[in-house]
C-alpha cells in the first residue's frame, strides 16, 4: 500500500535554466518513479519557459510549469509549490531548489521511512567534493559538528539521524503534515523560511530525520559558516545585500517565535561582532542592523528595497 502512494516533486527556480535542466534530469532518472513534477518559476528573465519547451518538458502530463507574476523568492516559490501539490491531492511532496541534484536512488532510499507525520531529508553533499557535507551538520543536543561522510561513519549511526535535516534540499513530507502545519511563510522571501518551516514541524511534533543512505548533491557556498569569535562560532556571510538583509530579519523573527530573547540578543551580538571585528564592513553592518530592526518589529515589507 505504501508503494502506491503518489509523490510530486516541487522545484523552485529563478534564472538558472541549465541547472534546472540537470535537476529535472535527475528527477526523471529516479529509481522510485515520481507521480508528477511541478516547477515554480519565480518570473525568470533568462527564457526558462522557452528553454523547457525546447527540451520537451512542457508537453507531458507528468510535468507542470507555474510561472509566477513576480519574483517571490524561495519562500514564495515553496509556498506556491506546496500549495499546488496539496490542492491537487498528491500524498507526498519532495522539495528542492533548481541547483540540487538528487542521486538516482535518493527517493527510493527516503521513501521507505516516510510516514504521514514525518519530515525527512537526505544527506546533502558538496557536488564538487561529494565526500564532504555541503552544509555542516551539528548533532542535536551536542556540540559535535560533522563536516564529512567520514565524520558520520565514525559514529556508526544506522539508518537515520533523528532531529535534524537540511531543509528544502530533497525534503520529503506528506500532505497530511501540510494539512496540520500549513505552508511556508512567503513574506520571508529568502533565507530563513526553511528554518522557520522546520521549527514549525518541531512545534507540531512532526518527526524529523536525515536518512544516512540517501544522497543529494548541491553546490557549496564557501562564505557560509565563516569562522569568528576566536574560531568558536560561525557566521553565514554573503556578498548579497538582499540575502544579508533577509537573513538578519528572518533569523530575528525565528528566534522570537521559536527560541527566546536570549537567542535574539546572541544573534545581534554575533552579527555586530562579525561586521565590526571579524570582517569589518560598515555597509554590511548597516544592512544587518536594518534587518535586525525590522525582524524585531515584525516588518516584512522592506526586502524589495534590495531587489534589482
Regions found by a protein language model. Name each.
Residues 89-99:
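Short beta-strand-to-loop acidic/aromatic patch adjacent to the donor-nucleotide binding site
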Residues 153-173:
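A recurrent flexible, glycine/aromatic-enriched loop bordering the glycosyltransferase active site
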Residues 26, 41-51, 70, 100-101:
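A conserved acidic beta->alpha catalytic loop
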Amino acid at each position: 500500500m505504501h508503494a502506491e502512494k503518489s509523490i510530486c516533486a516541487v522545484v523552485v527556480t529563478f534564472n538558472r535554466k541549465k541547472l534546472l535542466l540537470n535537476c529535472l534530469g535527475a528527477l526523471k532518472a529516479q529509481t522510485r518513479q515520481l507521480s508528477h513534477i511541478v516547477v515554480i518559476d519565480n518570473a525568470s528573465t533568462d527564457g526558462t519557459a522557452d528553454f523547457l519547451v525546447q527540451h520537451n518538458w512542457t508537453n507531458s502530463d507528468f510535468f507542470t510549469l507555474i510561472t509566477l507574476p513576480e519574483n517571490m523568492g524561495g519562500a514564495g516559490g515553496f509556498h506556491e509549490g506546496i500549495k499546488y501539490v496539496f490542492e491537487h491531492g498528491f500524498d507526498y511532496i519532495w522539495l528542492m531548489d533548481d541547483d540540487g541534484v538528487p542521486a538516482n536512488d535518493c527517493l527510493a532510499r527516503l521513501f521507505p521511512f516516510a510516514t504521514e507525520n514525518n519530515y525527512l531529508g537526505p544527506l546533502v553533499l558538496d557536488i564538487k567534493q561529494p565526500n564532504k557535507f555541503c552544509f555542516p551538520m551539528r548533532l542535536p543536543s551536542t556540540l559535535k559538528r560533522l563536516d564529512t561522510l567520514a565524520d558520520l561513519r565514525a559514529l556508526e549511526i544506522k539508518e537515520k539521524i533523528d532531529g535534524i535535516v537540511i531543509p528544502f534540499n530533497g525534503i520529503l513530507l506528506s500532505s497530511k503534515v501540510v494539512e496540520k502545519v500549513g505552508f511556508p511563510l512567503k513574506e520571508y522571501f529568502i533565507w530563513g523560511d526553511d528554518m522557520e518551516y522546520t521549527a514549525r514541524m518541531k512545534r507540531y511534533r512532526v518527526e524529523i530525520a536525515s536518512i544516512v543512505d540517501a544522497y543529494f548533491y548541491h553546490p557549496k557556498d564557501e562564505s557560509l559558516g565563516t569562522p569568528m569569535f576566536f574560531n568558536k562560532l560561525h557566521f553565514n556571510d554573503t556578498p548579497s545585500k538582499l540575502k544579508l538583509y533577509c537573513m538578519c530579519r528572518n533569523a530575528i523573527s525565528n528566534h522570537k517565535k521559536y527560541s527566546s530573547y536570549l537567542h535574539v540578543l546572541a544573534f545581534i551580538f554575533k552579527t555586530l561582532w562579525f561586521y565590526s571585528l571579524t570582517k569589518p564592513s560598515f555597509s554590511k553592518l548597516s544592512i544587518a542592523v536594518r534587518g535586525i530592526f525590522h525582524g524585531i518589529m515584525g516588518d516584512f515589507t522592506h526586502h524589495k528595497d534590495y531587489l534589482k
